[in-house]
Amino acid sequence: MSLEGIGFGYRERAPYASNPAFSRGRLVPEPESPTRTPFQRDRDRIIHSTAFRRLKHKTQVFIAHEGDHYRTRLTHTIEVAQIARALARALRLDEDLAEAVALVHDFGHTPFGHTGEDALNERMKKFGGFDHNAQSLRIVTKLEHRYADFDGLNLSWETLEGLVKHNGPLLGPYAAHPDIPVPQPILDFNARYDLELSRFASLEAQCAAIADDIAYNAHDIDDGLRAGLLTLESLDEVPLAKRLLDIVRTRYPNLDPVRTGHELVRRQITIMVEDVIEEAQRRLASARPGTMEDVHNQPRALVGFSDAMRAEEKVLKRFLFKNLYFHESVVVRRHAADRIVQDLFDACFTDPSLMPDEWRLGCEALDKAALARRVADYLAGMTDNYAVREHRRLFDRTPDLA
């Protein structure tokens, strides 16, 4: 299948695509909708959830209140969903499932991005640790309180499987990170509802995973240029970026730097998306899966970058880590955010009455591990701004994040 014509008109679902007509169902059985597939209902529940709205005020790379035009978890999530749908459409997969997994993949992130997660994990080490992917699962299976008949969102098996395993199997010979223990919340849920942790997730989930990489690689460049932490000249160090910039400069020799940066970003997204489509088609032609089960039983992911693009992406990531994620101004804010999260955990763990009613009720009956998890759930749900306000209320000495 060539890239020409993709997205035009009706194209038959691939035999190895996830099929909502054969969904494995939900943990709590529900009547089917007469107007929406199970995966469409999952997507809609995710969009209408409280956790989805909170993403608006959670940091992607920069502290959220630094500027209105930088990415937040919400804008990043929407961008990932768009790319995931495009990939699924090109590969004749279920677009709604790919979108649902993309929309839910960052639910468990703490305030202040990975800095907040690291800080919370440090405090939770004695109590099973903290992992944002496991927290996403807790949110959609336990912590969202919207429906009369169940806690969580009661998502379909396929969406939950994609959420937990979109980056690869967690157990077995094909585990993505065999040296890292599977987070306890995932093991606990899996004991109730087997997500087949040793097998690969659906192709739709794999689309969401690679879409995440494509989105943040490109858009962190955009935000870095906007913040003045990166320059177009510095990006000439990255072979992929230099090739694309040379194309832009040749075609538009008098283009201003802002538009030049945007032209770079859009071309980078395009070239990565096209690479994934071509590579996935090559792997599918080689593996020849005939059913969804064949996809689950593969020894490797079938959706991903080509070897050449993966090598170029690694160079780009190294550049971003050196020049953006560990830029001095970002590191200073990271230290301040780390202090806020750890201070809040210590305070609420020592005195649970500092938490709102719905979180502190019943804390006196909890053992230390259960109390620590309750506090972690509370803190993980905070937005950046709420965490700053709570720290100021409790300590009146909040570090300056501006």
Swiss-Prot record:
An example molecular function term from Gene Ontology annotations: triphosphoric monoester hydrolase activity
SMART domains: HDc
Domain annotation HD: ranges: 73-217
Keywords: Hydrolase
InterPro entries, per database record: dGTPase (IPR006261), Diverse_Catalytic_Enzymes (IPR051094), dNTPase_2 (IPR023023), HD/PDEase_dom (IPR003607), HD_domain (IPR006674), HDIG_dom (IPR006675), PHydrolase_assoc_dom (IPR026875)
Region (Disordered): 20-39
Sequence similarity: Belongs to the dGTPase family. Type 2 subfamily.
Protein name listed in UniProt: Deoxyguanosinetriphosphate triphosphohydrolase-like protein
Lineage of the organism: Bacteria, Pseudomonadati, Pseudomonadota, Alphaproteobacteria, Hyphomicrobiales
